[in-house]
Amino acid sequence: MTNKIEKDIIKNLDTSKNYVVALSGGVDSAVLATVVAQQTPNLRSVFVRHNQKHSDKLEEMANRIADNLKINHKALDSNLKENSSETKMRDARYEILYDELNDDEILLTGHTLSDKVETFFINLLRGTRVRGLKSIPKMTPRLRRPLLEISKDNLINYAKENNIEYLDDCLLYTSDAADE
């Protein structure tokens, strides 16, 4: 499993290029940052603060992951209000991340196979035309999604096998329900 995950992540990356990983503190970006950091010194990470209920915990984890990997890391504000919609947070995140990129850098995000399938069905339910059903593109000139063919379960297993620390998003939402 380990070698397959690593091969899938690095197969479309040119290790001579400069990369910025969108580091959320979750398993997807933690595994992505860990594998890419082992392959190239040309990596830094960015965390986007969304000012949501658990942003501080996610930011702490992202900082810890970057520190453990010894990569440059920066946290940036989105200026969103608490309880902003997923769409607003996503749009703000991409705007901030693209603004942060230098001309010679490529953004890496932790979108997985699960995200790809979810996006496909959301687009289908919206009545998107055939072109829109392609779901999430794996590569654009300034963006790579190396985890797009990997399931979240496989990433969780990889993280456990390799002692990669991350914050489980499900635990945050579960604790929300317990708080209410």
Where are the language model's segments positioned?
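Core alpha/beta nucleotide-donor-binding catalytic domains of modification enzymes
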Residues: 2-23, 27-175
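A short, hydrophobic C-terminal helix/tail in secreted or cell-surface proteins
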Residues: 176-180
